[in-house]
Amino acid sequence: MQVTLPYGGDKTVSFNVPEENFDGFLKPGVLAPASDPVRAIERAVDRPIGSPTLDKIVRSGTRVAVICDDLSRPTPVSTVLPVILDRLIRAGVRREDIHMVMALGSHRAMTPDEIRTRVGADVYANYRVVNSEFRDPASLINLGRTADGVDIVVTREAMDADVRIGIGNIVPHPVMGWSGGGKILFPGVTGEHTVAQFHMLGGLSDQRLVGLEDSHVRLRMESWVPKIGLDFVVNTILDAKFRIVRVVAGDYIKAHRAGVETAKVLMRCRMERPADVIVVSSYPADEDFWQSAKGFFNSEGGLKDAASTMILVTPNYEGMGPHPEYGECTGDDNVGVRLKKLYDGEDIPGDPLAIAVGTSMSKLRRRCRLVVVSDGVTRAEMDECKIEHYPLCELQKAVDVTLSRYEHPVVAAVSHGGEYLL
């Protein structure tokens, strides 16, 4: 039978698999989208969870930074922003006292056209919008050390405000459990060393963290948030067609946890039995291998055992991503030793983020067999990762070769690997 998967946002690809082996597409629950998305945002903002309303948080003279996630996320920022800005202006905040910060984390800077599309043409024309900074010391400020010994270094633009509001979206995350909430600050607007801290915690953990709302990494991150200050969040939960199902707003912990409960219904898939082979599209996390590998982490829970295989079908439009050493670290069986030394404060050469995330990937590829089908990364790059690679034109070959390794394989498919959780 023929199986069709998304390949990026505007293309599909197909392969054949024996019908007797195919257990079908793994699908989560279904919830109806909001009939009026703007009204859903307004209701959430006006009835916050665990927080005062915005008119009780700001007043005339308050300087506000609205921190928005970047183009690697499907968050409908251009729909959410006007509601927030309307409430701020109505509360007396002057337009010139409001600016937007695009929370890049370690991702590349967004172009002016990308920012305009992200925030909306009207907002772009009438407000100051800046990218966060990750490495430039002159654009970062050290707020000091937390009780557990982490230096909080943050982009100055985020601190040039009395009040910070975060806009994000809730989906599974390999390290943080779920995105959203305080994650808009960590790693959104923090510097390289600080960003590396929570990725190190993820790399050092042997626990599967994706899908845990109270993972030890998230709890530590949330304990760092007061050092920067996050006064209000607005988080969306979207369905597979990126329609708003629910919006939560208010306290960065209480509102986030309420949103996670909805996200679990929309994104957690149920399986009749574990699979020998899972073919997963990275959609919508298609930007690069740094992002698309989420499809592996999200789908691992559906595998039968260590002999099982995941085949990731992904465009990787921007190649391996922003960290050139990521591939080498992924392919290093002993990269965890480097990570532990780095975490213990030793001066270890190399990109700390590549070492941290590479450790998580190195562990994953040793727990099961990984295959990447992509025209966006090369065989040489995947060889460095110790991951099998096929170009897109050989998708069928990748499936056939993989199935030939099993006597009676159980095969499943995942259409939205960047968001669905097994």
Regions found by a protein language model. Name each.
Residues 89, 294-422:
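C-terminal non-catalytic interaction/assembly regions of soluble proteins
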Residues 110-178:
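An acidic, phosphate/nucleotide-engaging active-site surface
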